[in-house]
């Protein structure tokens, strides 16, 4: 709306100033407004102003100082300098609005950027915890053999192996613990009870529990 005011006032000011008269053809005013260079620059987001749109703006800005006659708008008791001053006021109003809009957009951008930065830092930290836990588990006697490579089995769906775990983005420590616990559970499901591998699986559960406790302690301190 403010941009419309600027275009109409500027065009009106030039027509009255050049014509040295107190009346302006509405058709001429509409044509000049829609041919204004600023209108052409905003063509992709701008609707052509109709005569009624222009009249609404003029009546709003100069109530009780205009009348219509034979397709012309006539101004009463209105000095050309008043139109210029009104134009400058509207321009300042536009500038203030744009400044506020820009500041609001900057605040929104900073909020999004801060959120994204925090998300990236969190993902990086969680990745460090994941790699630390995997490295520690690989140093143990039993667990690393458990999840280094699991053979496919119809008993277990969506089996995990070491490379897949390394590539997983974890949300938190509990998420990683759930993934690693699934390795133990999958192995239990695919291993004969009482076998040597089964005993290794039981021992690996203790290794996993100790590692998770260690990392949780490190996070808290």
UniProtKB/Swiss-Prot annotation:
Component of the NuA4 histone acetyltransferase complex which is involved in transcriptional activation of selected genes principally by acetylation of nucleosomal histone H4 and H2A. The NuA4 complex is also involved in DNA repair. This is Chromatin modification-related protein EAF5. Keywords: Chromatin regulator, DNA damage, DNA repair, Nucleus, Transcription, Transcription regulation. InterPro entries: EAF5 (IPR026226). The keyword Manganese does not apply. GO terms for biological process: chromatin organization; DNA repair. It is found in: Nucleus. Component of the NuA4 histone acetyltransferase complex. Belongs to the EAF5 family. Disulfide bonds: none annotated. The gene is EAF5. One of its GO terms (cellular component) is nucleus.
